[in-house]
Amino acid sequence: MNSKHGDQPYDFYEETRKYPRVHINLPITIYLDNKRYITASIYDISPDGLQVRCTRATAEALNPRGQRIKYEDNIVVNTKFTVPIDDEQHVVAVSCQIYYFVILPNVEGEDIAFGLKFKKFEGQSIRYIGDLIENELEPTIV
């Protein structure tokens, strides 16, 4: 694939970002309803959302019909993950809208990526995300 937006099907999303992304590898729980949830990995995070990666089997639980998910579909999920800040673990709980859902070529193990746009934060979650991003972007002095 060689389009004006790059060589990968998700390059368009990467090129249209409002904020820089911080690459992290943290587990995330995504609640499908009150009883069902999936776990996946956060690939990157920014002040307005995050990219999650998972296996096809996990993605099927989120999207059982396998239909293309777009932002306009307005699918909202509740998420929960823990972020390390200054040697402490803080729980982030936020409702997110699925922004995109793509198959990643040539990625071992986690072959699905989907973007989540933050919608509604619980408690101090927005502060914890800001602190995490600030800490990750801050240069390390050795």
Where are these regions (language model features)?
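Structured alpha-helical
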Residues: 1-142
